[in-house]
Structure formats: C-alpha cells, structure tokens
Amino acid sequence: VITAPQLRAARALLGLDQRQLAELCGLSVPTIQRMEASDGTVRGTVDSLMKLIDALERGGIELIGEGQISSGGRGVRLKSPAAPSEPGLP
C-alpha cells in the first residue's frame, strides 16, 4: 500500500517528473497524476500499482508502511547506496 504523499516524496527523491515516472512504470501521465492527487491511499488497478511500486523499488526507494519502525509514521527513504540502480534512474 502506498499513499499519495509517499508517491510524491518517492518521485522527488528520485528526481523524476511525472512523465519520467510514467515511462518507467509503463503507465500514462494522467494515471500518475490521478494517483498523486488521491486522498490518502493511492487508487488504481492491481497491475498499475504493482508496476508503480516495482519501478520505485528498482530506483532504490523503500516504502515505510504504517507500523514499521519510523518515528514519523508512513514515509519513504532511499535504500543504501550499495543497492543497484536501474538504467535511467539516479
């Protein structure tokens, strides 16, 4: 599960605009825009959500879910620099 604020933060950490993220995910720009505009949890088809999360994780993003160790609740962070990066991602 990913929230709209997590999605926007993850995209910002990777230095991507909506078009670039859409290309990496194989989704349309309007789909990314709708996901980022969601209230709370991002809505979409299971396939779209899996593509999105997979692309973010390949870029080195770690999603911090509710109940995971974090003083601020849900969030995102970059994995250690030793994690391999996908071509086209920083």
Predicted regions, residues:
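Recognition helix of helix-turn-helix/homeodomain-like DNA-binding domains
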Residues: 26-44
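Residue-level recognition of specific faces of alpha-helices
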Residues: 6, 31-34, 75
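DNA major-groove recognition helix of helix-turn-helix/homeodomain DNA-binding modules
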Residues: 25-26, 46-63
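DNA-binding alpha-helical recognition surfaces that contact promoter or target DNA
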Residues: 9, 23, 34, 54
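Helix-turn-helix/homeodomain-like alpha-helical modules used for DNA recognition
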Residues: 61-90
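A detector for short, charged/polar N-terminal pre-domain segments
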Residues: 1-2
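Short basic helix-loop element that most often maps to the first helix and adjoining turn
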Residues: 7-20, 81
